[in-house]
Design a protein with these regions (language model features):
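Short, structured secondary-structure boundary patches
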Residues: 12-16, 87-91, 139-141, 171-174
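Short gly/ser/thr-rich secondary-structure transition/capping motifs
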Residues: 49, 130-133, 167
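His/Asp/Glu-enriched, well-ordered alpha-helical/loop segment
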Residues: 37-40, 61, 66-67, 73-151
Length: 177
């Protein structure tokens, strides 16, 4: 984040984002017994837990402008297991798009790290602006597309590959269980 801030201070138009896995998962996930850690092989790799609060600070301060997903789901059986015996053959990436909004809302807004307005900015408006789609996208306004997510912030669900409410992807695990 420091390099992004320094670049912007020099007048460089620098953009930085993060993904849910870096806010909620850490390198201990890659150290699970057996081959389970292969589920968490991604680029960049998961870091130590203390990095998560630094990323949340970056989101709060505007150093990180958006939260994407790098959604790249591979089934553990059949695909990730291709790397048994050869780390370089583990497909790089994991599922992320399906739980993004609830993770960021709960970890950010409910967790007291960001405001509801900042939540909307980092999950919708900022990306629309960066890609030149605003105000057609990324806002609720006359003349804008009605791309609306109806989200119940009070609903409680347990994220699980076995929960049909939280898991619709054709992948055999959920990184956030």
């Amino acid at each position: 984040l420091e390099q992004v801030v320094l670049a912007r201070d020099r007048g460089v138009s620098a953009f930085a984002e993060t993904c849910p896995q870096y806010l909620f998962l850490d390198q201990s996930h890659t150290e699970q017994e057996g081959f389970e850690g292969a589920k968490y092989v991604m680029t960049p790799p998961l870091r130590e837990k203390w990095n998560q609060e630094e990323l949340w600070r970056g989101i709060r301060m505007g150093d990180l402008m958006s939260i994407s997903t790098d959604h790249c789901p591979f089934c553990f059986k059949e695909q990730k297991e291709m790397g048994i015996g050869d780390f370089s053959k583990i497909p790089n990436g994991g599922p992320g798009v399906e739980n993004r909004m609830s993770l960021i809302f709960n970890g950010g807004v409910v967790g007291g790290r960001i405001s509801v307005n900042r939540f909307v900015e980092i999950t919708s408006t900022a990306s629309a602006k960066m890609f030149g789609l605003f105000p057609k996208k990324g806002t609720i306004a006359v003349g804008s597309d009605a791309d609306i997510v109806i989200f119940d912030p009070n609903r409680k669900e347990t994220i699980s590959v076995n929960n049909p409410v939280t898991h619709h992807m054709n992948v055999d695990y959920n990184a956030y269980e």
